[in-house]
Amino acid sequence: MLKVIYRERIFIDTYQCIEYEKEFKAWSCWQSGGLYYFKVDRFNHKVLAVEDTISIKEV
């Protein structure tokens, strides 16, 4: 099981945004073309850009 911490941005307008750090657990991950793909359960995947991913740790 992996613990993933990532940065989520909510844009208020063209020049301002609010950044949050969020986390989730995933079964596995792989990287392809600047994106991380995380298997979060039997049927679903979550896709994050490499630059938005803060840490991936084995739990």
Region locations from a protein language model:
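Acidic, low-complexity, intrinsically disordered interaction modules
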Residues: I10-D52
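Boundary regions of SH3-family modules and the immediately adjacent low-complexity/disordered segments
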Residues: D52-V59
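Residue-level recognition of conserved beta-strand positions in structured domain cores
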Residues: Y6, V40-R42, E58
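Generic structural signal for short, solvent-exposed loop/turn connectors between secondary structure elements
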Residues: M1-L2, V59
